Amino acid sequence: MASDNSAKRVVYLEDIEVKPSKGSATKENASVAVTEETTDGSTVVDTDASTTVTEKKTTTGATKRQKAITDMFTKKSSSSSSSSSRSGPLPKKARSDTPSLNSIPFSLKEYQDSLSEEEKTLLTLECETLGKSWLKLLKDEIKKPYFLTLKRFLAGEGVKGLNDSAPNLKVYPAPKNIYSWSNMTPLGRVKVVIIGQDPYHGPGQAHGLCFSVPQGVAIPPSLRNIYAEIKAEYPSFEPSKHGNLTTWAENGVLLLNTSLTVRAHEAASHSKRGWEEFTAKVVDVVDRYGGANLGDKSSSDAGRGRGIVFLVWGAHAAKVVAKLDKKKHLILTSAHPSPLSANRGFMGNGHFKKANDWLEEKYGPDGCVDWTKL
């Protein structure tokens, strides 16, 4: 007989969750949970549950769907959808070959059960903290030899589990924050990607989002220049007194460094260890599914990536996006906002308004980012 586990398949629905409430404690488990018993006895469960809706089999064997399920996945359409016409359908081949994001099943327990004992140890942090909409598409990547080698290196640096806080741990950000970007910005809600290089290497600065620092930490010079450019584009913006960009992340801005850890006081100390290969795969996943749940949910290409905005500042970021389809995505390039280069093309680049103009044209007003809200 098949085990109970083999009869289960799990679909994580965090991508279609509305923006988390501002007061949420961790913002890491903001998924809607749906448990559904189907006619074949299989189960669909979102285990990051904050709300659960159950479907039970009827005596005729048909599935009785509760209204809550309908409310989650359908929306009454008007006579015509302007956002659908803006987005345009995917080519027929793309629609048939690419499953919709929320239809891809993933069971964390079954995945963990499939790991060797060493893999279970090395990948504990990924299984516990990598956002599930990302993990289900990166699960094979993190089992590759290069990534396991990276994890062995990090273990030697003291990064092993979620709550590592030994006095001699001098790696930033804290392990629990390495994958913050994946929890604050679910894959299907990505609107914009901003690419950094490696985390800030001073105490208390890095928290898993590029260019961002926790409240109470001095605003870095590059971020001050970013604020100055937003002020130039949106004159009503009053530059924040803090440098925490969490609100952007929650509003669909993926703040991704290409190296996700760094040794204290040693810039680029964890580069060329494997992170760049991993984050290149993250960009590939974004290329395929970023923004999959934006815009009209009833269109034939819903659930698949239809294009997003990449803000590419500096030569390093330009290399990361070099192979992306410029017809599918809006790729805006300029100098880096560092004080060393900001006046050579970053200031005055108009990127923030250009991004919103493109997003609104493609997805409607809900596709825009409020850059002035921090």
Tell what function each PLM region has.
Residues 2-112, 251-374:
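Glycine/proline-rich loop-helix segments at beta-alpha junctions forming the active-site rim
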Residues 110-121, 125-309, 316-319, 327-333, ...:
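A polyanion-binding, active-site-adjacent surface
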